[in-house]
């Protein structure tokens, strides 16, 4: 529930976006309130990443408005509340020697400590972020020696160290095993419930979104579904949505990973 008199982290009204002369997002309207864990799903080319990049101001809209914490023209003080973790953020080359703690410290870097001189407050932010991510036991390990799930938590902790309140995640579940996936999802749920963070996560993994997020949005140029994650239509019903078919590998089970495929262009 939205706290009275405080604007929501995100409010989008009648947003449309073109890319390469093609309409990718059409008439998108939604509000995401504080403390929500929202899963954004849809086919390749459906506009998910385009939506995130437009929120961040990296792409221009054709029409419509985006408000972050009540601001259409977002000041730096509000930008500091936004944490962005791209799909490839955890793909750190093995020849780069950096520990978990050093990676998380990057989240606090600014003009006052660009030479890695951290105040007591900044060190406290780093310690808190590492604790929230459950990485205390590996904070001095090289990031390349961690599991895929631990690396994802580390890059999210970097965003937390900057005091981000609204975290945007692009495909954080790609390339990690089931146990790491479940651990990461529990961590994200904890951030919402205990730390009152707001999360918007893009994923192709519908089963994971249904199990973990509070709300699911199905985006394919337009919003096709916006509601409780556990009330989302069954995978068999996805064939009724234009250009979509459910695809799975392996044996049928409740925990099976599903992806959405489309013949459309990549987003």
PLM region spans:
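Helix-to-loop junction immediately C-terminal to a conserved catalytic motif
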Residues: 56
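Conserved ABC transporter NBD signature motif
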Residues: 64-78
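Conserved ABC ATPase "signature" region
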Residues: 105, 120-138
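Catalytic Walker B motif of ABC-type/P-loop ATPase nucleotide-binding domains
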Residues: 167-171
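H-loop/switch region of ABC-family ATPase nucleotide-binding domains
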Residues: 203-204
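H-loop (His-switch) and adjacent beta-strand-loop-beta switch element
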Residues: 216-228
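ABC ATPase nucleotide-binding domains
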Residues: 230-267
């Amino acid at each position: 529930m939205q706290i009275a008199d405080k604007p929501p982290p995100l409010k989008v009204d009648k947003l449309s976006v073109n890319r390469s002369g093609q309409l990718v997002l059409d008439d998108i309207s939604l509000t995401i309130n504080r403390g929500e864990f929202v899963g954004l799903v849809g086919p390749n080319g459906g506009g998910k990443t385009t939506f995130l990049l437009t929120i961040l101001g990296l792409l221009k809209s054709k029409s419509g408005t985006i408000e972050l914490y009540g601001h259409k023209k977002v000041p730096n003080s509000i930008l500091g509340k936004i944490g962005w973790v791209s799909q490839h953020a955890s793909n750190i080359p093995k020849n780069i020697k950096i520990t978990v703690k050093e990676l998380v410290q990057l989240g606090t870097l600014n003009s006052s400590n660009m030479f890695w001189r951290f105040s007591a407050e900044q060190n406290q932010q780093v310690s808190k972020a590492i604790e929230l991510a459950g990485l205390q036991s590996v904070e001095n390990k090289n990031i390349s020696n961690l599991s895929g799930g631990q690396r994802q938590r580390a890059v999210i902790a970097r965003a937390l160290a900057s005091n981000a309140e609204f975290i945007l995640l692009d495909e954080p579940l790609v390339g990690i095993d089931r146990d790491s996936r479940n651990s990461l999802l529990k961590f994200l749920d904890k951030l919402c419930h205990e730390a009152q963070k707001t999360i918007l996560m893009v994923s192709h993994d519908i089963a994971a979104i249904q199990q973990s997020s509070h709300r699911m949005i199905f985006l394919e140029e337009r919003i096709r579904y916006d509601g409780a994650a556990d009330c989302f239509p069954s995978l068999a019903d996805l064939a009724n949505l234009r250009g979509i078919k459910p695809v799975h590998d392996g044996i049928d089970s409740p925990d099976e990973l599903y992806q959405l495929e489309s013949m459309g262009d990549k987003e």
